[in-house]
Amino acid sequence: MASERDPLLPVHGEGPESPSRRNWKTWIKHGILLILVLSTVIFFYFFSSHKSKGTNEKPKFVIMMVSDGMGPGSLSMTRSFVETLNDKEGYRLPLDEHLIGSSRTRSSSSLITDSAAGATAFSCANKTYNGAVGVLDNEKPCGTILEAAKEAGYLTGIVVTSRVTDATPASFSAHAANRFMQDLIAEYQVGMGPLGRSVDLLFGGGLCSFLPKSTYRSCRSDNLDLLKYARKKEGFQILLNRTDFDELSNAQLPLLGLFSDYHLSYDIDYQPEVQPKLSEMVETALDVLLNATNEDTSKGFFLLIEGSRIDMASHNNDPIAHVYEVMEYNRAFEIASAFVEKNGGSLISTSDHETGGLTVGRQVSKKYPEYLWKPQVLSLALHSIEYLASAIVNHNQNTLLPYIEQFVLPAIGIPDPNPKQIHDIYVARHNIFNLINVLSDIVSVEAQIGWTTHGHTAVDVNVYGVGEVTEHLRGNMENIEIGQFMEIYLNVSLSDVTEKLKDAPIHGAPDRPSLVETSFSDRLVGFGADLF
């Protein structure tokens, strides 16, 4: 009787194994063993080769662009303005083709963020309280993407149109419990912090924070000479004017370019012989960083670019300066985009928040509103509101009325002013803040542009991308997700840097007005326009 373990059917060929079959089995075993050995050798060869030749990897480039204070309305206004100015119906801004999503901007302390908390969300990939510069809610410093990149062997750069110690650049390169501790921020930027120097290239304004208190143009509260420290201790090449910038060739890092005492000029007030534009600084920075990457076989670079004064124009409710700043930011974006398309990497552009509550359209009377706005008014303008307010304050009071009528109002796009406009400006003539408000309102009403605030708003802002980032960031996102992407993409550790910074100083004295007799507009933008 068959056992339960016996096969149901007879096995084919059952019986003694032939010699030829045994030989084939032996060859198969040897072949499999050989393949396994070869595979192991090949794996370890390539693994060790990869490790020993890490410098031959294709470098990674991350360009983070921040259009400070620019909201969706800014783009609508600028697009229509360019269409009118150049008779280009259907015109598209350079940014338009690269829209990938939108960002929510709240901070940990408010539904409406300030620039410091907004920038720290990008740099540390964490929410924090308004006013915090590279510092978390517990008032402990957090490692930034720029610092982590530098620690990992990348080159780093910052290009802005504000003081380099202002909230956004500071939040990537320094740590302060309050954004107005600009003495401390400048010290971090020249390498006096616990990590040493983290920034290889720094372009913008804000010279006053690097000069000792005894110096005429200083705004420091002490006598530290940070230019001397930067040059002698850290080897910075220092550029202080347009000539220095133009003569820059075969530049060696580190580079420190401080092209004004405070912020750089608005684009509409730009004097080419005095200081470079944002787009020029961006082009030079990219060239210098790329050349340095090729020469020292670094991993690549991280570059922060900020269109800082878009925000400041909106704080003033100045549609003239605002539209020209947005145009210049688009030129800078075009340069950065071309770089990434040629060399690879990731370009991210977004805003930290919207400023001003800008609306393209305004009800200017109690009657039912017209469905229009008038970009042609802005196209006639010659200067920013700050520039003209300063000019009024400094003008001979005996000839002020004709000056307002014949120069100031035509310079804001109103060639045929009415008596009320002239009167309102004249009444406000002694107070720079009142003048800015009056002038901004006159041109905004004339152009039918609306504003809801002189501060920030909670509106979501656009996110744009070029290169590999477009495969990872999509749709509506929290601002910290942008920082998280950069950390993963560059393969760096923010937490490791945070650990190194656990005893880093975050308290310092606020800056002070310098002794130099600057224009009222300089004082305004240096110490009051972006306090929100």
From Swiss-Prot:
InterPro entries linked: Alkaline_phosphatase (IPR001952), Alkaline_phosphatase_AS (IPR018299), Alkaline_phosphatase_core_sf (IPR017850)
Binding site for Mg(2+): 68, 166, 168, 306
Catalytic activity: a phosphate monoester + H2O = an alcohol + phosphate
Name the UniProt record assigns to this protein: Alkaline phosphatase
GO biological process, one term: nicotinamide nucleotide metabolic process
Amino acids binding Zn(2+) 1: 311, 315, 456
SMART domains: alkPPc
Cofactor(s) the protein requires to work: Mg(2+); Zn(2+)
